[in-house]
């Protein structure tokens, strides 16, 4: 027996009028009305308390009265009018399936967004103020359609230090809690939404090369919004697919049928939308390499913001970068990740022209304004509310099965902490909070003075030997070994993080009562690694060893080369 489906069409006249009344509560804010309201003169006169209350109530009600006058522009249209009228822009952008794992629309409709006539052969018609008041129709499943303008020339920007943080921010485009009812709360520190999205692939590819910081700059323009009815008519294809699902307890065979539905329609459907356009640029820069080049995260973010504002025409044509920004942009904007330390991903949503290379065109500001002007005719979804698909199924057993398979699919694709570039770091003298070296050419120096042989500092007595050690302003001195031409010290010295490659100087001395005699001097320039050496003195031989371990992310003989994999 086929399952009963939630949302089968019931187009009684009463329900349609309820739909019409809901649609006609559209608010269309206009500055002129607000300004007129602010200019209403209020005289300071003495009046009875009752009259004063009535006057205040009327003033408070005035905005509502103005709105009612405006929203009645939507009306019922005859069948002839409905056939002639075009749909509102973006009428079919809700009702589509949505996959939260890939954080994208599936292109398959679960809701019928093409039907516009009620059983009494009427539809809802509304004037579109962005199309010179042209009368346009709404699908019968659409409620609360509203034209409004919300555009800004201010770029929003943010920094993210991990794949985890970046993906969680991208999920903010979904403006409701999409996980309600899917039993996903107890999974722990993982990323669920967008775990297999294009953004996740981009971010992880950068983190696999090197520790990356992500700077996001975006600008959004919104022109329309609407939502679907709570029990919309389902699409014929989705209805047919649901009827083919088994009601029995999930088996390997039935699981495949449910997973096929998810492959086609996703995990959710889009219930509410805001339409317009968005330009978003994600810049991944190699955190530690940027630090070594002398650019802080805040400086890079500021320079990128100025560069994009200039490209979009938000700044005067004669505006210029600061010297540091100019050096950053000209020297490091290569798309090759190893050639510079930044790479970009540009996303353009909405509009009739796609311009991923906006920053490299002859006149990108013209391209941007042309794209912006096309949004009123060709909007796309800039934010949405989504609900799980099982909410649309009236058969309780099939709904429960679908809910379980959706939860299973989302959990299977989660990203664990070790896949997200998360790393704890304790700052050290040459490491910052991101575990990045602050300066190249530095490493930890360890020195061992072992012994000396055949010292002949005095003619008639044996040597009272000690060693002076000098390194880049650091001084150490061994203990004195009395009456021994072959002294043994086995003394160890830790110099900490030092600048590698400076002069390491040893002076061997014979301590006497009146004045000390120098047995000889030895000079070397330390390099990375462990080295055991002997040094011929003027009177004898000195034996010692040293080791240098480059600071994190540094390599090379003198630790002067940046290496993402070096620990």
Model regions and ranges:
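Membrane-permeabilization and membrane-interfacing ectodomains
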Residues: 67-428, 432-444, 448, 455, ...
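Intrinsically disordered, low-complexity regions enriched in proline, serine, glycine
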Residues: 457-459, 478-480, 505, 516-519, ...
